[in-house]
A protein has these predicted regions:
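N-terminal zymogen propeptides
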Residues: 1-26
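Predominantly the structural core of cysteine protease catalytic domains
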Residues: 21, 26-29, 49-58, 72, ...
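Alpha-helical support elements that line or immediately flank enzyme active sites
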Residues: 42-66
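Short, glycine/acidic-rich hinge or "gate" loops at secondary-structure transitions
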Residues: 65-73
């Protein structure tokens, strides 16, 4: 069930789980319905983790409502409330990176999600107000992988719940060029 809006519009997802993976699958067109929202620009804010999490949640809501509810959720509110300048935050500084643990904590603690229209994204801002969350989030699926070829959990999540959020760690040490290189 998804409760949405002040009228508490109720959407029912019958819980059908698909276990067979098709040869190809595109969330942008599943039986002429898109389960992804528009691409957003984080600029140089170091907040990809927040954008990834909100895009996955927006996709999950689209998937659960068969495209009936499309939301633009606030990455700004998430990244600021989970940083060191917030009473709910961690030791992470704002705008210099994060991870899925932060986004999951924000959502399951009831701090969000909130709409983008309440707290617009500004790449280098540090503070956000606390708003009532749009809906309650629970049962976040955390996918473990045994190695880089173990992708069935990701396929299962894409097929049944929508987009996924993926964390990765980049450090200046990766720029050494000996056997790996990252420049971002």
């Amino acid at each position: 069930y998804i409760f949405y809006d002040n009228d508490y519009e109720l959407f029912y997802n019958d819980g059908t789980i698909l276990n067979e993976f098709p040869e190809s699958y595109d969330l942008r067109n599943v039986s002429n319905v898109s389960f992804v929202t528009n691409v957003k620009n984080q600029g140089n804010g170091g907040n990809c983790w927040s954008f990834s999490a909100m895009a996955a949640l927006e996709s999950a809501i689209l998937k659960a409502t068969n495209g009936a509810v499309s939301l633009d959720l606030s990455e700004e509110n998430m990244k600021n409330l989970m940083a060191c300048f917030s009473p709910f935050g961690t030791t992470y500084e704002t705008n210099v990176g994060g991870n899925d643990r932060l986004s999951n904590a924000y959502l399951t603690a009831g701090l969000g999600p909130v709409l983008e229209s309440l707290d617009n994204y500004v790449p280098k801002d540090y503070l956000s107000a606390i708003f009532n969350p749009l809906t309650h989030i629970q049962n976040i699926l955390w996918i473990d992988r045994s190695d880089y070829l173990d992708n069935d959990g990701i396929k299962f999540a894409l097929l049944n719940y929508g987009a996924v959020s993926v964390s990765c760690n980049f450090d200046r040490d990766y720029r050494n060029g000996a056997n790996h290189y990252y420049y971002g």
